Amino acid sequence: ETLDRSFEGWTPAVFEMLDRLRAEPHIDQYNKEKPGVTDDLKDPFRRYRDDLVVNWVLPNRLNFETEKHVFSRLLKNDFGAGGCHDHLWMSFYRPHTRRLEDVQITHRVSPDGFAVGLYVGAYATELLQQAKARIFAAPATYLDHVNRLLQDDDWYFYTHRGSGENETRTVFDAPLDEVPESVEGAEGIYLRHYISREETLALGAALVDRALDLVFEVWPLYRFYLADRDGQWGQ
């Protein structure tokens, strides 16, 4: 089935710009890049977002906020230090909460390429504790969800503690024999699929199709995290 798409694909220009922001992650470089930030990054990402809405959210009648504050910011909230990120990401969220306080199906563009995945943690402290409770109450079910993806290439499962220079990560790229010890003390849990820069460019507009396939892959785990003790899920 052909998707209704307005996104035309990422261009080499966006990755070259993000390369420069990675090399000089500061507001001065951001200001130099402002035209490209709009034309090469933000506007195409909005069209990509619109395609997800038209082809996934609306047909499935999903109760997601798709307009307000679904995108991250390039400029860091670092108390005036002027730092700048080298990536931009987005996630829809349930209307009664906020993007950073919900379980997130994330879409991320960076100098390395594009990534789609699932994250719980950071400001979503209550949902992280709920997810951990679900994991340890049904470890076999959890491993089934995770390993189904880890058996394929370019999927990574990792936990993290801390942030910035103090962040530590425990990373797995192959099926797990047991729930990692790092899960219990984790401040965030990721399951993410990476698409290389070269493949992202080659996909063009079809990145939307690939991304939706990946969304469907993580959807059972998204529901697992949000299910209550009786296994019931709802938005």
Protein language model features and the residues they cover:
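Long, solvent-exposed, polar/charged low-complexity segments
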Residues: E1-E24, F45-Y48, F136, W155-Q235
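Soluble, non-transmembrane alpha-helical interaction regions
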Residues: E8-W10, L74, L143-R148
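Active-site acidic/histidine clusters and adjacent loop/turn architecture
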Residues: D19-F71
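Glycine-rich, often proline-containing surface loops adjacent to acidic residues and nearby aromatics
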Residues: K32-E33, P111-G117, E187-S196
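Short histidine-centered catalytic/ligand-binding loop motif
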Residues: K34-L41, Q130-I135, L203-L207
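Surface-exposed helix-capping loop/turn segments at secondary-structure junctions
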Residues: D51-N63, L149-L150, F224-G234
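Hydrophobic/aromatic-rich structural module bridging two neighboring secondary-structure elements via a short loop
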Residues: L58-Q104, R108
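Compact, glycine/acidic-enriched structural inserts
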Residues: V109-A174
